[in-house]
Amino acid sequence: MKQILDFIPLIIFFALYKMYDIYVATGALIVATAVQLIVTYALYKKVEKMQLITFVIVTIFGSMTIFFHDDNFIKWKVTIIYVVLAVGLTASHLMGKSVVKGMLGKEITLPDAIWAKINWAWVGFFSFFAGLNIYIAYELPLDVWVNFKVFGMLIATFAYMIATGVYIYKHMPKEEKNNSSDVSVDD
């Protein structure tokens, strides 16, 4: 349910962009992100830090897009969020902590060197897509950027998550691999 909530603002943005324009879609994105935050808090009694950061960035850059009637601001939002993620992962690693390990380390046992590689791989992913977003935003038409933002980045993120899962599975201790592949069927 929580993952579905994360995609609702994106779906609303895309639908309203196709029906109206970037400014209506941006206004709806701000409202949908605020509603998402409220619903998340109502259901789970907490809001993740990244959701809050995303809301602030969406609100600031979305408002600037509408106020100045300039779609460049909303185009920058994606890059800024990805830069924040890359910097956050880098800073946490330099402080001796791994955000990825913190999220998954309770369920999965891996050597710290593997967690570090996964962390750096995601830093690379976010950095690459931050730059690619700017390139597409300024070198290609707005329709291409919207499709890239909604579909390209979504598909790339899912694919990278799957690749990360495969990499993790490859480096899991044998006991955990056996436990994760055991399926008990009761007659």
UniProtKB/Swiss-Prot annotation:
<keyword id="KW-1003">Cell membrane</keyword>
<keyword id="KW-0472">Membrane</keyword>
<dbReference type="GO" id="GO:0005886">
    <property type="term" value="C:plasma membrane"/>
</dbReference>
<feature type="transmembrane region" description="Helical">
    <location>
        <begin position="148"/>
        <end position="168"/>
    </location>
</feature>
<feature type="transmembrane region" description="Helical">
    <location>
        <begin position="118"/>
        <end position="138"/>
    </location>
</feature>
<comment type="function">
    <text>Plays a role in cell envelope biogenesis, maintenance of cell envelope integrity and membrane homeostasis.</text>
</comment>
<keyword id="KW-0997">Cell inner membrane</keyword>
<dbReference type="Pfam" id="PF04279">
    <property type="entry name" value="IspA"/>
</dbReference>
<feature type="transmembrane region" description="Helical">
    <location>
        <begin position="50"/>
        <end position="70"/>
    </location>
</feature>
<keyword id="KW-0812">Transmembrane</keyword>
<dbReference type="InterPro" id="IPR006008">
    <property type="entry name" value="YciB"/>
</dbReference>
<feature type="transmembrane region" description="Helical">
    <location>
        <begin position="22"/>
        <end position="42"/>
    </location>
</feature>
<comment type="similarity">
    <text>Belongs to the YciB family.</text>
</comment>
<feature type="transmembrane region" description="Helical">
    <location>
        <begin position="80"/>
        <end position="100"/>
    </location>
</feature>
<keyword id="KW-1133">Transmembrane helix</keyword>
<protein>
    <recommendedName>
        <fullName>Inner membrane-spanning protein YciB</fullName>
    </recommendedName>
</protein>
